[in-house]
């Protein structure tokens, strides 16, 4: 019974970032949501960025060879990362505001609707996601570069 529970938790935490990524794609397909709630989309991008950042920070820490990590410890670390991400999601770190400001500047310059801007952004995010799946540090650096082009 307990192994099934831990397997469920482990699988659930591994695909958390994929779920957030898929939510972004679903929002792209839902035109009403993307037109009226661009701030919600930027909050989801901020949430995804925070989750990637926290998990990569944990991976970069030194691990002692004498202290082996058990499966339950990795589950706990993933759950802790999710909790910290959810805590920062409520308050935010200001990235969503920056994205909204960049979208407004871009929108004013190009006279585009929120849907057109989100299409351009999500297409960049999709190509970014499919091309870079192995290197964690490059993922964070390229994600930050992606925000410059909004």
From Swiss-Prot:
InterPro entries with a match to the protein in the record: Flagellar_prot_FlgJ_N
Domain of life where this protein originates: Bacteria
Protein's GO biological process: bacterial-type flagellum organization
Key words of the record: Bacterial flagellum biogenesis
Keyword Transferase: no
Matching Pfam families: Rod-binding
Keyword Metal-binding: no
Miscellaneous notes: This protein is shorter than other FlgJ proteins and lacks the muramidase domain. It may be degenerating and may no longer be functional.
Annotated family: Belongs to the FlgJ family.
Name of the protein in question: Putative flagellar protein FlgJ homolog
Species of the source: Buchnera aphidicola subsp. Baizongia pistaciae (strain Bp)
């Amino acid at each position: 019974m307990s192994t099934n529970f831990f397997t469920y938790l482990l699988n659930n935490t591994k695909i958390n970032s994929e779920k957030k990524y898929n939510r972004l794609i679903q929002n792209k397909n839902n035109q009403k949501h993307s037109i009226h709630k661009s701030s919600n989309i930027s909050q989801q991008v901020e949430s995804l960025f925070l989750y990637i950042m926290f998990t990569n920070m944990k991976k970069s820490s030194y691990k002692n060879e004498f202290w082996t990590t058990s499966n339950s410890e990795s589950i706990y670390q993933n759950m802790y990362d999710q909790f910290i991400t959810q805590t920062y999601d409520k308050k935010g770190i200001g990235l969503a505001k920056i994205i909204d400001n960049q979208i407004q500047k871009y929108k004013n310059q190009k006279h585009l609707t929120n849907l057109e801007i989100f299409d351009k952004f999500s297409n960049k995010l999709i190509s970014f996601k499919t091309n870079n799946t192995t290197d964690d540090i490059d993922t964070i650096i390229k994600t930050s570069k992606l925000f410059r082009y909004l």
